[in-house]
Amino acid sequence: MDVRDIILRPVITEKSTNLMDDKKYTFDVLLTATKTQVRNAVEEIFDVKVKNVNIMNVRGKDKRVGRYTGKTARRRKAIVTLTNDSNDIKIFQDENKEDNK
């Protein structure tokens, strides 16, 4: 399995953006991914050093549309803590730098 298949997408919420100040980044990962696989994938993709990985399973919520009920998809979320001497992960592009080019 390729390392780019393990990390699905970054989680962009108010809480996760506040955690970025502490070098903690949140990603949605495969349901079968382990902490070791997430660590290796983040280190290889972003060229950083990982200090710690916390993983949680988020269950799907019940949703209704009229009389029809269903569930949203369950997901697995990983919070990756980087070492203090590691570089930051650039999730957001700086618009000012692109305009100056």
UniProtKB/Swiss-Prot annotation:
Give the Gene Ontology MF terms in alphabetical order.
Answer: rRNA binding; structural constituent of ribosome
Which Pfam families does the UniProt record give? Ribosomal_L23
* GO terms for biological process, alphabetical: translation
What InterPro entries does its record include?
Nucleotide-bd_a/b_plait_sf, Ribosomal_uL23-like, Ribosomal_uL23/eL15/eS24_sf, Ribosomal_uL23_CS
Q: Which UniProt keywords apply?
A: Ribonucleoprotein, Ribosomal protein, RNA-binding, rRNA-binding
Its GO CC terms are: ribonucleoprotein complex; ribosome
Annotated function = One of the early assembly proteins it binds 23S rRNA. One of the proteins that surrounds the polypeptide exit tunnel on the outside of the ribosome. Forms the main docking site for trigger factor binding to the ribosome.
Binding partners and assembly? Part of the 50S ribosomal subunit. Contacts protein L29, and trigger factor when it is bound to the ribosome.
Give the record's family classification: Belongs to the universal ribosomal protein uL23 family.
What is the name attached to this protein's record?
Large ribosomal subunit protein uL23
Q: Which organism is it from?
A: Lactobacillus helveticus (strain DPC 4571)
